[in-house]
From Swiss-Prot:
A family per Pfam: PDGLE
Chief place where the protein resides: membrane
Compartment(s) of residence: Cell membrane
GO cellular component, one term: plasma membrane
Regions that span the bilayer: 11-31, 85-105
Family membership: To M.thermoautotrophicum MTH1706.
Keyword Cell membrane belongs to the record: yes
This protein's record includes keyword Cell membrane: yes
Highest rank taxon of the organism: Archaea
Organism ancestry: Archaea, Methanobacteriati, Methanobacteriota, Methanomada group, Methanococci
Keywords: Cell membrane, Membrane, Transmembrane, Transmembrane helix
Membrane topology: Multi-pass membrane protein
Full protein name: Uncharacterized protein MJ1570
Length: 115
């Protein structure tokens, strides 16, 4: 990857801007409950009826590990610290995605990963 390429620089600036702006997602809905689509299985069951989501409720505990559950750092409950937690979560997500991308490139085309 050519870090001096103007397109690469613009892309990196975009990623940095999105990481910095990501706390807006929590601040905009701070007093209004969960953001649209961020519901847990119990919330979905409450909205549409438990009989319609019994499979979802049953399978919800299969994957219980998340590096930063709810984009949060435990104990950081006030809006300022929650915003910092969102930013840290975004940085971790970007690092994991870029790492997965490079690992996949290295597996598929080892010559491309070296250059």
């Amino acid at each position: 990857m050519n870090w001096q390429d103007p397109l690469v620089k613009k892309f990196l600036y975009l990623i940095v801007a999105m990481v910095i702006l990501c706390p807006l997602g929590i601040l905009l809905v701070w007093n209004y409950g969960d953001a649209w689509g961020e519901w847990g299985p119990e919330d979905v069951a409450e909205k549409v009826g438990e009989d319609k989501v019994s499979g979802l409720l049953h399978l919800a505990d299969i994957w219980s590990y998340a590096p930063l559950p709810d984009y949060d750092i435990p104990g950081w409950d006030d809006p300022f610290h929650a915003s910092i937690g969102y930013i840290i979560s975004a940085i971790v997500g970007v690092i994991l995605c870029v790492g997965a991308y490079y690992a996949l490139i290295k597996i598929v085309n080892p010559k491309a990963a070296a250059g």
